[in-house]
């Protein structure tokens, strides 16, 4: 039987810190972030289906959220301002991410690669589903900014402004519903939400 290092690599998601150039009150790793993205992506899919006549598979989208940053166990987390500093850097980094996705996929026993490709390989991921995951990813980054700002960390003020613009460009009815229904609670204390 062939040995695989796939899950040993995924177990290292908790070692990859997000926001590496920012001073954080509360650190966040890609394992924690991916779970929150899965929660939010699942909610967005449900909202789309129940409120806006969507036809998505919320469980599938939650899985995509869980796996959306797995390539970072090989690449690390590249800060967004650097990653998108100019189109050439963004294009080259996308190639690095694709190579990392392929490397991870190749670590699986061959009989499972077809099953994991739609979760790991950008070329195989359903584009409509991925839009929801990207929305959730942006929402979770925005929520992190709120958390840090509410803890008195003004380091995240510019990131919050940038993410507000991103949320506007990615706006959909389901995202607006999520923002209006759930986000205000992130500005409250534990006593206030209990």
UniProtKB/Swiss-Prot annotation:
SUPFAM superfamilies: HD-domain/PDEase-like. Belongs to the 5DNU family. Keywords: Cytoplasm, Hydrolase, Metal-binding, Nucleotide-binding. InterPro entries: HD/PDEase_dom, HD_domain, YfbR, YfbR/HDDC2. Substrate binds at residues 18-19, 33, 69, 77-80, 137. Residues 30-142 form the HD domain. Gene3D superfamilies: Hypothetical protein af1432. Its EC number is 3.1.3.89. It is an enzyme of class 3 (hydrolase). The record marks 18 as: Appears to be important in orienting the phosphate for catalysis. This is 5'-deoxynucleotidase PBPRA2627. It comes from the Bacteria.
């Amino acid at each position: 039987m062939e040995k695989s290092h796939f899950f040993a690599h995924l177990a290292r998601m908790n070692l990859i810190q997000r926001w590496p150039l920012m001073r954080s009150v509360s650190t966040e790793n890609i394992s924690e972030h991916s779970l929150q993205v899965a929660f939010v992506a699942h909610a967005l899919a449900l909202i789309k289906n129940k409120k806006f006549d969507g036809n998505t598979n919320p469980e599938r989208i939650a899985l995509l959220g869980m796996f959306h940053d797995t390539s970072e166990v090989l690449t690390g987390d590249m800060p967004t301002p650097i990653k998108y500093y100019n189109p050439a850097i963004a294009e080259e980094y996308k190639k690095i991410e694709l190579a990392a996705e392929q490397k991870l996929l190749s670590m699986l026993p061959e009989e499972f690669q077809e099953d994991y490709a739609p979760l790991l390989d950008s070329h195989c991921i359903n584009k409509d589903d991925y839009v929801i995951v990207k929305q959730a990813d942006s929402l979770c980054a925005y929520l992190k900014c709120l958390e840090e700002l509410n803890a008195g960390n003004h380091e995240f003020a510019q990131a919050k402004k940038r993410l507000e613009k991103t949320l506007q460009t990615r706006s959909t009815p389901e995202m607006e519903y999520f923002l209006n229904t759930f986000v205000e609670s992130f500005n409250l204390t534990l006593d206030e939400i209990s």
